[in-house]
Amino acid sequence: MLVLTRKPGEKIMIGDDIVITVMEGRGDGVRIGIEAPRGVTIQRSEVVEAIAAANVAASQAGPETEELLKSILPPAG
């Protein structure tokens, strides 16, 4: 991991097309701005981890969940 020290207003380049700007420091947090092409997905790691955990939980649903869904949804076909 590369660790850099930057002041508000200073920038970090990632490749040729991603720019991270330090906006301001707030207490024990930092506000940053990210400029990237539209095709680049930018997510906070805690959101990605929460979605992954929810997907795992959903994939492990028991038979009672299947029966509940069958009673709610119309028959296929």
UniProtKB/Swiss-Prot annotation:
Any one of the GO CC terms: cytosol
Chief location category: cytoplasm
Subunit structure: Homodimer; the beta-strands of each monomer intercalate to form a hydrophobic core, while the alpha-helices form wings that extend away from the core.
The organism's taxonomic lineage, starting at the top: Bacteria, Bacillati, Actinomycetota, Actinomycetes, Micrococcales
An annotated Gene Ontology molecular function: mRNA 5'-UTR binding
UniProt-recorded name of the protein: Translational regulator CsrA
Family annotation (Pfam families): CsrA (PF02599)
Family: Belongs to the CsrA/RsmA family.
Protein purpose: A translational regulator that binds mRNA to regulate translation initiation and/or mRNA stability. Usually binds in the 5'-UTR at or near the Shine-Dalgarno sequence preventing ribosome-binding, thus repressing translation. Its main target seems to be the major flagellin gene, while its function is anatagonized by FliW.
UniProtKB keywords: Bacterial flagellum biogenesis, Cytoplasm, Repressor, RNA-binding, Translation regulation
Localization in the cell: Cytoplasm
Disulfide bonds: none
GO BP term, example: negative regulation of translational initiation
SUPFAM superfamilies with a match to the protein in the record: CsrA-like (SSF117130)
